[in-house]
Each structure stands twice: as C-alpha cells, then as structure tokens.
C-alpha cells in the first residue's frame, strides 16, 4: 500500500486544494500554474469565471456559496493589507550593530532590531557561538528589547553575516547600521561630553 | 490545543530509547491497526524518534524533524502531515463546504456541519464519543483537521445540535507551521 503524496502549496503551505481558504489565493494560483499546470487547469480551468460556477456546485447552495466567496475575498484583502504593512515596517526598520568596550582591550558586539525581521535570536546566537568560537548570549537592552551579545571584536563579521541572512530572507534593502561605541567613548573622554554620542 | 503554541513552549528535547520506540510503535498500531502495513515506511526501523516535552503536558514525537504524532493524555494523536501520508488508517468524518472556514479558524465543529448534505458520517454503529477523528471537507481529498468526538457519531445524527467535534489540530495552526529547526 503506497503512501499518499499530497501536493503542498509553495505559497501558503496548505494542501493545494485548500488554497482558496488561505487568504493568499491569487499568489497560490500563480504558483500552481507554474508548478503544477495540469492541476491548475483541472481546478481553475482557463477562464476564471467558470471557477466560481464549478465551486458553486457544492451542497451549501448559491446564496451561502456567494457569501462564502465574499468572505474569502475579504480574507484575501485583509491578508494582503497585513503583509504590505509588515513589509513596510520591515523596510523602515533597521538592524543595529553596536560595538561596545568591555574592558580597555576587549569589546563586545550588541545586535538589536532583529525581532522585526523574524530572525530567531536563539538560533543566531548559537550560530555565532560556534562560527566565531566565542561567547554569545541574548539579553534585554535599555529599551527592554532583546539583543544578541557577541563577545569579541567581530563587528565586521557579524555585519557580513546579518547582511547574508537578510538577503536570504529577500530583504536585501534593509539597513544595517554599525555604531562604534567603543571608539566614541575613547574620543568622548577627550573631546565631547558623554551622552552626545547616544543621540545617533 | 496548539492555538498559542510557540517554540518557547518546548521544555526539553530528547531521543527516544529504542526499547521505548518499539513500545510507541506498538501503541500506535494498537490505536490505529491499519497503520500496520505502512508503519515501517513512515517510521523506518532505524529512524530515531525524538520527543519534545512541551508546556501543558503536550508531548511531540518527531521523525526526521517532522512532528508525526503527539500526546496530551494517554492516546497518541497523529499530526496532519502524518494523516496525509496514509489517511485510510484513521476514523474520518466530513464537514460541508460552509464549515471549512470555521474549522481552519480553529473552531469546534457544530453538529449541523456534520449532518448536512455535503457532510459525511459513518453508518451505524459509527464511532464512539472521545474517538480521535480526522476531518475532511466536501469536495476535498485531503484532511484539514484532527479532532475529538464530543458525542458518538450516532448521537451527532440524532441530536444535531451543539458542538460535535472538539478541535485539536488544523491546517495553518502553529503545529502545522512548526519546523524543528
Ligand atoms: Zn496556497
């Protein structure tokens, strides 16, 4: 007895026949057409008008079917709006890498702003710990937001890795800001008053 | 059951010892006898079952990083990914098209959604109360949810009011989207 092989949608991850309920139907259909054209033709035909008629041959009757279609359309609009909002938020946010002095010779790197980009900080800290063979932890900063702390002077390496991670997630345009607080502090001792460097 | 489940709810992860692994498989078979013919394909003899102990006494069992079944009390409950591999093994009911949206939102299933023309219940004697059932939908081939009968299928037909199935796990819930890594 062979195992069943279900086709999961590459967009919404539902079994493809449930895409209409995912709120991402338009993109789901485009995916199906690309990846499983025979199923696309079978389910949605060439003319989209026929689709709703085909689907309307369900037991729940025209009126309820129409209501359902409307609800599903609304779901899709909502989903789209939400995704747009999320994307806008991501694009207007940035990751901040701060180099801080720990002792006179040693420093550490604090990375904040990751939560917006759905980057798993626990995983990232494990990756850094093994990649750079150093101590790495998660702690809360002054704004009570979590940040990843890497021990050692690794700002450049961390920056490169964060860039590659963002690119992997299709968010190449996201800004990564590097602040060298360790250096500034030294300068601060001689030239400016402390506090002014925090403004940046 | 998984409405609010997140990675943070996983307390410990461990490998299941081979003796216990055998017991687990035997238990699965006792509960779902039709799995007999495919069990070694789904959980190969050499596979390592992992156990994730989670908040709320939920235990997830994974093979190759995929949750195959889980446990809250005594019974083993298949994940949808497992059900999809071999749906014949599980007691199944079907809801009408109108109920799909609500099931996917995590609601319990009302009796009329199980007795209307687009729905399907087994013929008498049917399934007992508390049976773990797979939930299919009108005009769909794959299962969309797993639940527990709040009354026997005969009672559902007879009473036809109120909640018939308690929702446990559905397409799109955090268990469905969970990935081990
Ligand atoms: Zn889809």
From Swiss-Prot, chain A:
Q: Which SUPFAM superfamilies match?
A: eIF1-like
Q: Which GO terms describe its cellular component?
A: cytoplasm; ribonucleoprotein complex; ribosome
Q: Name one GO biological process term.
A: formation of translation preinitiation complex
Keyword tRNA-binding on entry:
no
Its keywords, alphabetically, are: Cytoplasm, Ribonucleoprotein, Ribosomal protein
**Domain SUI1: from-to ranges:** 95-166
Q: Its quaternary structure?
A: Interacts with the 40S ribosomal subunit.
Q: Which family does it belong to?
A: Belongs to the DENR family.
The written remark on domains in the entry is: The SUI1 domain may be involved in RNA binding.
Q: What is this protein called?
A: Translation machinery-associated protein 22
Q: Which organism is it from?
A: Kluyveromyces lactis (strain ATCC 8585 / CBS 2359 / DSM 70799 / NBRC 1267 / NRRL Y-1140 / WM37) (Yeast)
């Amino acid at each position: 007895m062979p195992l069943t092989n279900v086709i999961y949608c590459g967009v919404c991850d539902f079994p493809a026949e449930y895409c209409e309920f995912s709120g991402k139907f338009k993109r789901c259909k485009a995916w199906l057409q690309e990846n499983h054209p025979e199923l696309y033709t079978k389910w949605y035909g060439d003319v989209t008008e026929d689709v709703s008629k085909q689907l309307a041959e369900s037991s729940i009757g025209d009126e309820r079917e129409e209501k359902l279609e409307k609800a599903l359309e609304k779901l899709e609009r909502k989903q789209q709006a939400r995704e747009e909002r999320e994307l806008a938020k991501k694009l207007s946010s940035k990751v901040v890498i701060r180099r801080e002095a720990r002792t006179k010779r040693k420093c550490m790197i604090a990375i904040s702003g990751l939560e917006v980009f759905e980057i798993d900080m626990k995983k990232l800290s494990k990756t850094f710990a093994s990649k750079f063979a150093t101590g790495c932890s998660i702690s809360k900063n002054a704004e009570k937001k979590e940040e990843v702390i890497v021990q050692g002077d690794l700002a450049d390496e961390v920056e490169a890795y964060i860039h590659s991670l963002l690119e992997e997630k299709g968010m190449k345009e996201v800004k990564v800001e590097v602040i060298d607080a360790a250096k500034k502090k030294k300068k601060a001792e001689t030239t400016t008053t402390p506090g002014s460097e925090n403004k940046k | 059951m998984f409405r609010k489940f997140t990675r943070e709810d996983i307390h410990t992860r461990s490998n299941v010892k081979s003796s216990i692994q055998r017991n687990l498989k035997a238990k699965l078979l006792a509960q779902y006898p039709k799995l007999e013919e495919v069990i070694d394909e789904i959980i190969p003899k050499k596979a390592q079952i992992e156990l994730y102990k989670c908040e709320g006494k939920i235990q997830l069992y994974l093979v190759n990083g995929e949750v195959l079944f889980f446990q809250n009390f005594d019974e083993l409950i298949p994940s949808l990914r497992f059900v999809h591999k071999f749906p014949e093994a599980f007691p199944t009911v079907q809801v009408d098209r109108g109920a799909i949206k609500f099931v996917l939102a995590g609601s319990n299933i009302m009796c009329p959604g199980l007795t209307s023309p687009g729905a399907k219940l087994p013929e008498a004697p049917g399934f007992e109360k508390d049976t773990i059932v797979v939930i299919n939908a009108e005009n769909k081939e794959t299962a969309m949810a797993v639940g527990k009968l709040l009354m026997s299928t005969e009672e559902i037909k007879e009473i036809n009011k109120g909640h018939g199935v308690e929702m446990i796990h559905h397409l799109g819930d955090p268990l469905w989207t969970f990935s081990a890594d």
